[in-house]
């Protein structure tokens, strides 16, 4: 008898999980545009470069609490993010050119 009750308990848990999954599927998901994502990525790259530049200026002025290794790390992060942005742009341009060269 207890085995049947255990199986019924598992079945009821599965049904509850299925019901909650259906409820989550019915909620409208926010749409994120490609242009919006690209703009946000460019903003993050710009913010990284601005932070690195600010950190370097503070170090140059001799402000306390700004270490050289932090400045170098921030500058390297800014450089890497810029290179990543350039590579993404190159891939987008190549994809655009490929689409434009397709015959309809």
Swiss-Prot record:
It is found in: Bacterial flagellum basal body. Transmembrane segments: none annotated. InterPro entries: FliE. Keywords: Bacterial flagellum. It holds the Pfam family FliE. GO terms for molecular function: cytoskeletal motor activity; structural molecule activity. The keyword Cell wall biogenesis/degradation does not apply. GO terms for biological process: bacterial-type flagellum assembly; bacterial-type flagellum-dependent cell motility; chemotaxis. GO terms for cellular component: bacterial-type flagellum; bacterial-type flagellum basal body; bacterial-type flagellum basal body, rod. Belongs to the FliE family. NCBIfam families: fliE. This is Flagellar hook-basal body complex protein FliE.
